Amino acid sequence: MTVPTASRRLRIVKTTAAFVAGSTLLAGCQVISPRQTDEMYDAGDGVSVNVGPLQLRNVVLVSDKVGAAGVVSAAVGNPTAEDIALSVTGAGEGNSAQVTIPKHSTINLSVDGSKVTLAKVDAEPGSMAQLTFSSAQAGNSPVGVPVVPATGYYADLTP
């Protein structure tokens, strides 16, 4: 059995102390740096809104010009044990649509055959349009929604 010499023991102590000091310094950086996952934000083009138990994410209104029809694109989650009817209303008389969100599911309004089309959009692409989402369980939830042109990955979303 070999016994460490004094210089070897000193090197081990110094290495351990350097490791502990470095770990403490690196861990301390996290204290003053906020974690991005602590902040809620919309990472896509659209906005998020909750209508009672329904969770709408990445909501946008696809339309090429003011006065033209528009398609509402969004992912809608229903975590409840019952189907929920969701109404979407835009500006103007009779400018609304309704879709049923099945229980325990998430659907994409623009992809899953549940296309929601409004007859008239009162805002130009690049601006915000006021839409009201409503359900019997939650009442009305007005929200400003970005209007995007039917180009790029929205090219297939024409009324």
Predicted feature descriptions by range:
Residues 24-28:
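C-terminal motif of bacterial Sec signal peptides marking the signal peptidase cleavage site
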Residues 30-33:
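Bacterial signal peptide processing site
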Residues 36-49, 140-142, 147-159:
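Extracytoplasmic/periplasmic copper-protein system
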Residues 49-63:
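N-terminal edge beta-strand
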Residues 67-73, 122-130:
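Short, solvent-exposed loop/turn segments enriched in Ser/Thr/Gly
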Residues 69, 82-89, 143-145:
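Short, hydrophobic/aromatic beta-strand segments
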Residues 74-80:
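Asparagine-centered strand-capping/turn motif at beta-strand->loop junctions
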Residues 91-120:
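Intrinsically disordered, low-complexity Pro/Gly/Ser/Thr-rich segments with frequent PxxP/GP/PP motifs
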